[in-house]
Design a protein with these regions (language model features):
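Helix-rich effector regions associated with P-loop NTPase G domains
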Residues: 11, 37-56, 60-64, 71-91, ...
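Phosphate-binding glycine-rich loops and their immediate beta-loop-alpha structural context
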Residues: 90-97, 101-156
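Residue-level signature of catalytic and energy-coupling elements of molecular machines
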Residues: 5, 45, 121, 178, ...
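Beta-strand/loop nucleic-acid-binding surfaces
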Residues: 22-40
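Structural detector for short beta-strands of small beta-barrel domains
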Residues: 1-10
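SH3/SH3-like beta-barrel fold
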Residues: 13-17, 25, 50, 67
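Canonical P-loop GTPase G-domain recognition
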Residues: 137-191
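A conserved segment at the C-terminal end of the G1
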Residues: 193-209
Length: 273
């Protein structure tokens, strides 16, 4: 049977089948992405083939579901660790766009991080919208700096929005951007991704955390990647490889916060074609 990977817990995956069933699965076999060895050969957003086998251990019989094949990806976003391991990690696959949540204070998102994310998304043909969050906490000088950053990125062609997920200011205006699309939500730890999702998806109840006073950096509240439906009810149907789904039109992919974003060596054509 075929389905969509909607959750990655590290050692296992949750797959929403085309028939609307939710299955806990593990990977069977080795998968490669164009020769790149990644920490997660299967990513949230992947279209996969699932099979099951019956296992009998000490007179206990259970059905084990395996991911046996990954359909060709139309795109993906991959990051390389900035530590010595240099391992790669696929954030998500088959996305229509990415929202990069950034903050100019508490914590401050560096332009280096933003530019590396944009370069990686550009290489894999993923449109990006920059979401400047926590506008309610900014001083007059910080608001001026934020406006300069917005002008900079709009000048080079990126759409930017300024919001406060905490107060809700500007959040409803994001909904038309998300309608009918699979959207990756990414950013540093502590920039307010979980708060934003809680605003957009009533009942999501994602855990949030305060900023570390000592380092003014965020602390992880999301520990795994997950697709969250923006429309539809409990009975969900996975979008096919053509993107059609009768019950769910819009998805948000929630990912753990990223402290650093390393990029792979890219050819000039990957960024300009």
């Amino acid at each position: 049977m075929k389905g969509l990977v909607i959750k990655n817990t590290g050692s296992s995956y949750v797959v929403l089948t085309d028939e609307g069933r939710t299955l806990n699965c593990i990977v069977k076999g080795n998968f490669r992405l164009k020769g790149i060895r990644s920490t997660n050969p299967v990513a949230v957003g992947d279209r996969v083939e699932v099979s099951y086998e019956t296992s009998s251990l000490k007179a206990h019989t259970s059905n084990l579901h395996f991911i046996t094949e990954i359909e060709d990806r139309r795109n993906y976003i991959i990051r390389k660790s900035i530590n010595l391991s240099k391992q790669s990690h696929i954030l998500a696959a088959n996305v229509d766009q990415a929202l990069l949540v950034v903050t100019v204070s508490k914590p401050e998102t560096s332009t280096t991080f933003i530019d590396r994310f944009l370069a990686s998304a550009e290489a894999y043909r993923v449109p990006v919208v920059l979401i400047f969050n926590k506008t309610d906490l900014l001083t007059a000088n910080e608001l001026h700096y934020q406006q300069l950053m917005i002008q900079l990125y709009e000048t080079v062609g990126y759409e930017c929005r300024a919001i406060s997920a905490e107060t809700g200011d500007g959040v409803e205006e994001l909904r038309p951007l998300l309608d009918g699309k699979i959207t990756l939500l990414s950013g540093n730890s502590g920039v307010g991704k979980s708060t934003l999702i809680n605003r957009l998806v009533p009942g999501a109840n994602l855990r949030t955390a305060d900023i570390s006073d000592a380092h003014q950096t965020g602390m992880h509240t999301t520990t795994f990647s997950e697709m969250i439906p923006l429309t539809g009810g409990q009975s969900l149907c996975a979008p096919t490889s053509q993107g059609d789904s009768p019950l769910v039109r819009s998805w948000l992919i929630d990912t753990p916060g990223i402290k650093g974003f390393g990029t792979f060596d890219m050819e000039r054509e990957e960024l300009t074609s």
